[in-house]
Amino acid sequence: MPHLFSKACQYFPGGVNSPVRACRSVDITPPVVTRASGDFFTDSQGKTYIDFCGSWGSLIHGHSHPYICEAIQQGLQRGCSYGLTSEQEISFAEEIFSYLEISNDHKIRFMSTGSEATMTAVRLARGVTERPIIIKFSGCYHGHSDVFLQEIHFQQTILDTVDLTQPLTLSLPFNNLSLFLDVMNQIGHRVAGVIFEPICANMGVVLPLPGFIEGIIQTCRKTGSLSIMDEVVTGFRVSKGGAAALHPLKPDILVFGKILGGGLPASAVCAPAAIMDYLAPVGKVFQAGTLSGNPLAMSAGKASIALCREKNFYTQLSAIEDDFLSPIEQMIQQSGIPVTLVRYGNLFSFFFSENRPNNLKEVQLCNTDIFRTFYQQAFLKGIYLSPSPFEASFLSTAHSMENLNYAQQVLIESLEQACSLV
């Protein structure tokens, strides 16, 4: 039977509607999913995979969680889309503000994608400050808006036309606080905003060095630039309050996505009203969207956050992470194979290097050929990690102990086999 992916290639560029799904960096034929439930999905060939991608971190409760599905079913009876302010939007906003303990002097705006939300955040920063320059950090991914497409791990795929935006976007090395401070001392008065991932997830998992995030926020306050924390990946995942709760200094603007929609398309920008009221129709900064605040996505998102409220939710996630990944870490340390496992808050990545990378240049020194072999070995045995050496993989509360034990053994064997070929 021909693989269904060949038919996908007839209709979609590269057979996909988002590039990394093509699995080219791991050199496998991408699975075409027919159904998914809990911690697994089934492809068009009838093979089942334990899923550690989870729709790129969107599914912290796993696939097809009954409570979220029920919320969507009930929402369908009320209508799929209104193009008007809805009760569901208001109810979901109340839930978010209550859950994250956001003060009443803040406001939120819903959109459909992370790219829309980050694009809106930087446009808002420019509108508020009336300054032109945006600073980002190399290796951090903030969506596919032109303003962000430089110094990312798939740089070679970007058209030269993007260079037109680069004089207004400056990309600096992640974790290099001294260079950031030097740059801000020179041009801080022209910087509208500084956008950053609090934990990088799109060059693999790269953690901030102590003081780096605080240094960004503190410097922005001194220069009048707006700090923008991109929590599309980390929001509602690494702790109850997301990554922002892990730092004493809070950013000016927060961006959410993925888990926010409970598996449906939803994102948001949240900031004090003094900033948010620059958005149209109150202010001069334009942003719009036909499906922004879609009622089905709002219903799914509210159900997703309600599940996060359950007692010991993050304690349970932490235990799953520890039970699954600690033995793999121990094997790596004892065997001396050239692999570094980086993990935080149920995100994890394997870097084929003896040292933990702290920035994009160090990530690019890792051996992607060995990663490819490792990935293929695990994939053949039914383990689906995020299919790139530059992407995080994710755990969820749906991962069963039985499947985790199996996956753990497969990953250990695949690591050993891949490294034996060096």
Swiss-Prot record:
Gene Ontology MF terms: glutamate-1-semialdehyde 2,1-aminomutase activity; pyridoxal phosphate binding; transaminase activity
Any one GO CC term of the record: cytoplasm
Keyword Cytoplasm: yes
Catalytic activity: (S)-4-amino-5-oxopentanoate = 5-aminolevulinate
GO biological process, one term: protoporphyrinogen IX biosynthetic process
Modified residues annotated as N6-(pyridoxal phosphate)lysine in this record: K258
A Pfam cross-reference name: Aminotran_3
Cofactor(s) it depends on: pyridoxal 5'-phosphate
EC number: 5.4.3.8
Chief localisation class: cytoplasm
Class of enzymatic activity (EC top level): isomerase
Record flagged with keyword Cytoplasm: yes
UniProt-annotated location(s): Cytoplasm
Pathway of action: Porphyrin-containing compound metabolism; protoporphyrin-IX biosynthesis; 5-aminolevulinate from L-glutamyl-tRNA(Glu): step 2/2
CDD domains attached to this UniProt entry: OAT_like
Keyword terms, alphabetized: Cytoplasm, Isomerase, Porphyrin biosynthesis, Pyridoxal phosphate
Source taxon at top rank: Bacteria
Disulfide topology: none
InterPro entries the record matches: 4pyrrol_synth_GluAld_NH2Trfase, Aminotrans_3, Aminotrans_3_PPA_site, PyrdxlP-dep_Trfase, PyrdxlP-dep_Trfase_major, PyrdxlP-dep_Trfase_small
Subunit and interaction comment: Homodimer.
Similarity remark: Belongs to the class-III pyridoxal-phosphate-dependent aminotransferase family. HemL subfamily.
Protein known as: Glutamate-1-semialdehyde 2,1-aminomutase
